[in-house]
Amino acid sequence: VRVVEPFFWRAFGWARLEVDVARQSVSREADRDAQQVARTLIPVASRDQALWLLARVMPDAHPNPPPDAGPPSRARLKAPLSFHFLAAWFGQRYVYARTGRVQMSTIIVPLVKVQSVRLKSGPLQRTFHVATVDVDTAGRRWQASARCRDEHEAVEMVRHISERARLSRRVPPPRPANPIPVPAAG
């Protein structure tokens, strides 16, 4: 699932919620438009309403990054324009990755859906001692990428995410105990 907050929407507190569906083939342009609509859970809503719907689709998902979710300060040299918008973190059930200066998007991947976790580090990244962790799923539209992470942190992320993904496939996910109230339109 992806929470998208384009630049001009943020002033109004608007967001879009999308879902990446596995194995959708596109044969014609008309089918492409229909599939885009089918992938959009809510095209435009207040951020509170989008987060309410997210809580219904993915219980216990928290798309707001914790204070330590950002990249190390030396990554500012590698990604000067997007540095403040990069974040990555994971919990007991989900992996989160936030990117985008103009169109900020937070990708939320259930650990049970993780197919592979990869560590990438090009020559420029190695110069700054940072790396990227890619979390792959069966969907084809996007992937969760933890960009510009400290190289040691990235290795630990790969290890922890892989281990938690393996464990999560063994245990059925819990259901929310209380119904979630609908936020007021505002």
How does the language model describe each region?
Residues 1-186:
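N-terminal basic, Ser/Thr-rich segments that initiate or prime the first beta/alpha elements at protein or domain
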